Amino acid sequence: LGYVHTLNLSHPVSPLAGMEAILINNMIFKKEKEGHEKFLIEFNRFNEPKIFSIDGKKPRIVIDIHNVSSVRSGLSRIDVNGTLIKQIRTALDRKTNGMRIVIDVEANRNYEVDQTFYKAENIFVVDISEDIKKPAEAKPKAAKP
């Protein structure tokens, strides 16, 4: 008996296969009282994005959303008038159906970031406030030779 080997050239089944695709209906920036700034994302269904921060000279908060089928037009850049948030940029990758949202925040500040999902409304909220309990770290001085 012989064995026949065939190449499987089709795409493997994605772990997201069979799930209803994500539609992003709206994204809104809100400046609240007491130094809170909020970024709201309105979905068509429950979705828990991956969120992480990048420190450095240009600190940012990054939100990754998978299985996105469409985004309402005009949402590639969201206007902000924040004290903590400088700008919000978005990019949709049609090949992977992933969306990345980058929130650029002011440097030399300590932040507190909370995230909440309101299931009844399908709204994911990122709440950013300045952490006044601990001062921003001073940059270390260069050593003298």
Predicted regions and their residues:
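Short linear recognition/processing motifs and adjacent strand/loop elements at protein termini
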Residues: L1-P145
